[in-house]
Every structure is written in structure tokens, then in C-alpha cells.
Amino acid sequence: MVKNAFISVRVQEKKEKNSGSVEFQVFRFTNTIRRLTSHLELHRKDYSSQRGLRKILEKRQRLLAYLSKKNRVRYKELISKLNIRESKNR
């Protein structure tokens, strides 16, 4: 992933006022997941990072499941905006 993409994400994070919203949390987890994925491409045997990545993926999946139950429209907008695949269970 390109470093400039992370910089633009950081700027968006600072502009966001409601850091407790589900959308913002999913956005932050997605950014962290992408960063860890690019790290693991270089360091395949970094098992601590692999474990952390799995934990963050699970947290994001739980938040997305919650959002899809509460507001399906916001869920669809978020996954299309962040380019995330929809869960198989939904």
C-alpha cells in the first residue's frame, strides 16, 4: 500500500468529530488492517502481528454485524465506501 494513502487517512481521522461512532471505529480498524497486512507481506513470520491482525479482524466483523442489524443502509454505504466484502452470513 502506498504511504500517501495512510497520510490522507490520518487527515480524515483528525477531521472526524464523532470518534465513538461505529462507522469511525470500522474505518480505523480497516486502516490498521491494511497497514498490518502490508507489514506481514514483508515479515511473514511475525506471529505476534498475525495474532493482532486476527483480533482486529474479529472486532471489525462484530462491529459490522452490529451495524447491519441496526441500520442496513449505513452498513451498505460503509462497506462500499471502504471497499470491504460483505459478510457471508448477511
Curated annotation (Swiss-Prot):
Q: Give the matching InterPro entries.
A: Ribosomal_uS15, Ribosomal_uS15_bac-type, uS15_NS1_RNA-bd_sf
Say yes or no: keyword Iron present: no
Q: Which one GO biological process term can you cite for this protein?
A: translation
Q: Which SMART domains match?
A: Ribosomal_S15 (SM01387)
One Pfam annotation reads Ribosomal_S15
Q: Which PROSITE patterns has this protein been placed in?
A: RIBOSOMAL_S15 (PS00362)
Q: Which UniProt keywords apply?
A: Chloroplast, Plastid, Ribonucleoprotein, Ribosomal protein
Any idea where this protein resides? Plastid, Chloroplast
* Cellular compartments per GO CC: chloroplast; ribonucleoprotein complex; ribosome
Primary residence: plastid
Query: What does the record give under GO molecular function?
Result: structural constituent of ribosome
Oligomer and partners? Part of the 30S ribosomal subunit.
Record-stated family: Belongs to the universal ribosomal protein uS15 family.
Know the name of this protein? Answer: Small ribosomal subunit protein uS15c
Which species? Citrus sinensis (Sweet orange)
> Gene that codes for this?
rps15
